[in-house]
């Protein structure tokens, strides 16, 4: 942004993944003015971030609105399922879909794998199937399917289905009083970029009342009533209260936004209608069903319909819903709200127009580095045994940094590369700082950091060591030379690009990069990771999407990692 001539304030969003206190200091060094905190933080962790926040940087935190199941900036689910990157704001929301687990799920997975093998698919989903085929899938209790870390997937247990990853809306409501007076926290954030004026007006009004009247019980009651009229989803406080953390999903419930106003009926001519539970006004906006149903659609109300009256719905014949489908009110233009909008529109039209100027500055030229051959890396999910602890000539064996991996023999630590996790939470920072220091003292000099801000865990002396290598890992989501140039200035010596890049970008970026680059060639790459845990989904057991794509979940530390049941493999390319 600065290279393009922008001189205003720079805000780092939740996609930047600043999840631990040291990250704020690094953001300050890069010139950031404002940081949006992750939604997964508790009130105690928000205080930790505030205490560590340097002068010149202010904080924002979310208080209301939609929740993503996966950690922001660490979700690739939409890319896997829809070919559209959630990191670029084009998420197709696969987490909102109905998934099933148990019963014949594992058998279906096995059959799909066999079909893929017969069709010659040896690179994508067939790779998993080839491993699954070697297992005995029909024997109860037998472990089937390699998870990539020495464990195997369990066969299906009882059959179940639900929206296991579709989060309710975050709502701090009366608890926002605990956020007042926190140093550096200057802004409350309401998620609602795709919402209508009704939602925006009601949520903002409610939280303004709560902010201005923190100890007034009548104001509290009024604000709660206004929030109930905002037409959002069922709400949750998620992890905000550390003593009452909750998994913010209701697998058996409806987690789409809107107020239930009726159910579909079908008249004698086959036309759909509803008898609304509340009066409907002209310009109200309705949603029929939920997003992953074939008949899902949205439509306006064209005339006033009293409670219990009949409203015929003009829906294309190919989208005619079945009787009993729920209908929701998702937006409303009350007379008073329309008047307010008109007043603001008039004020906007009276304001003088700003003159715009062309940007005259040019981005700094990035000087490409000379070709440098770096060793291939093989990242192990489990601790090496026997001969695996010996140094390899053709590649660098790597381990994820953890208390368990750091406890291996001191004599072999320097033979491995050490990968830091994609997410470090505030209560984990001190632990990882100690682990990094311990590994360094035992001779470790090759580190892969899966967030740029993790350089804050290393001392200046470490970063200046000529024998050390610091690689920006694939979870840094690197996609252009300008980003690589910033990483070089931060002290990185190499980088691994984002797996989301297309083939053209993969081939073009190394020619322009100021650092040696790598890419993820093969392995179990997650669709996402979450701090919320699972409710209903059993770990290490396959579950399936509506189109029978198979996945499985595994717990690592505080986070649940979700993997597709096929390995990424670009070896042939």
Each model region followed by its residue ranges:
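Long, basic N-terminal domains or extensions that often function
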Residues: 33
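Active-site pocket-lining/capping segments in soluble small-molecule metabolic enzymes
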Residues: 1-22, 36-187, 194-486, 490-573
């Amino acid at each position: 942004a600065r290279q393009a001539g922008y001189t205003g304030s720079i805000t780092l969003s939740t996609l930047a993944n600043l999840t631990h206190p040291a990250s704020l200091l690094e953001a300050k060094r890069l010139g950031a003015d404002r940081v949006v905190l992750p939604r997964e933080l508790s009130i105690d962790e928000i205080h930790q971030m505030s205490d560590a926040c340097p002068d010149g940087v202010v904080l924002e935190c979310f208080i209301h609105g939609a929740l993503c199941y996966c950690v922001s900036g660490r979700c690739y689910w939409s890319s896997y399922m829809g070919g559209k990157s959630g990191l670029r704001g084009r998420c197709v929301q696969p987490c909102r879909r109905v998934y099933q687990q148990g019963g014949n799920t594992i058998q279906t997975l096995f059959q799909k794998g066999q079909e893929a093998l017969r069709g010659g698919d040896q690179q994508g989903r067939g790779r998993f199937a080839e491993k699954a085929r070697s297992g005995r899938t029909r024997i109860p209790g037998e472990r089937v399917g390699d998870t990539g870390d020495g464990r195997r997937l369990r066969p299906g247990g009882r059959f179940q289905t639900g929206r296991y990853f579709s989060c309710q809306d975050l709502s701090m409501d009366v608890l926002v009083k605990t956020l007042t007076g926190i140093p550096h926290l200057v802004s409350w954030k309401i998620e609602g970029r795709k919402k209508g004026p009704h939602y925006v007006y009601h949520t903002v009004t409610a939280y303004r009342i709560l902010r201005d009247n923190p100890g007034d019980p009548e104001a509290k009651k009024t604000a709660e009533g206004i929030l109930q009229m905002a037409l959002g989803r069922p709400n949750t406080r998620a992890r905000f209260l550390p003593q009452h953390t909750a998994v913010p999903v209701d697998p058996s419930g409806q987690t789409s936004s809107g107020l239930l106003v009726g159910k579909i009926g079908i008249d004698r001519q086959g036309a759909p209608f509803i008898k609304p539970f509340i009066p409907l006004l002209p310009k109200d906006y309705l949603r029929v069903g939920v997003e992953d149903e074939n008949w899902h659609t949205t439509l306006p109300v064209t005339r006033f319909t009293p409670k219990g009256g009949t409203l015929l719905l003009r829906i294309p014949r190919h989208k005619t819903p079945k009787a009993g489908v729920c209908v929701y009110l998702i937006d409303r233009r009350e007379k008073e709200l329309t008047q307010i909008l008109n007043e603001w529109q008039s004020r906007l039209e009276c304001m003088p127009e700003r003159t715009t100027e062309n940007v005259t500055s040019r981005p700094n030229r990035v000087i490409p580095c000379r070709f440098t051959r770096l060793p291939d890396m093989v990242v192990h999910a489990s601790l090496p045994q026997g001969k695996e602890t010996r140094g390899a000539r053709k590649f660098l064996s790597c381990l994820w940094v953890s208390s368990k991996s750091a406890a291996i023999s001191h004599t072999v630590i320097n033979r491995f590369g050490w990968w830091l996790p994609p997410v470090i939470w505030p209560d984990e920072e001190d632990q990882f700082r100690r682990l990094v220091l311990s590994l360094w003292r035992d001779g470790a000099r090759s580190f892969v950091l899966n967030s740029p801000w993790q350089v804050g865990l290393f001392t200046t002396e470490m970063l200046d060591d000529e024998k050390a290598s610091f690689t920006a890992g694939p979870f840094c989501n690197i996609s252009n030379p300008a980003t690589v140039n910033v990483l070089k200035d931060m002290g990185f010596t190499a980088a691994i690009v984002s797996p989301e890049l297309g083939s053209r970008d993969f081939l073009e970026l190394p020619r322009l990069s100021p650092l040696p680059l790598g890419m993820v060639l093969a392995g179990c790459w997650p669709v996402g990771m979450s701090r919320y845990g699972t409710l209903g989904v059993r770990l290490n057991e396959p579950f399936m999407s509506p189109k029978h794509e198979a996945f499985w979940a595994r717990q690592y530390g505080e986070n649940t990692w979700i993997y597709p049941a096929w390995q990424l493999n670009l070896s042939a390319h």
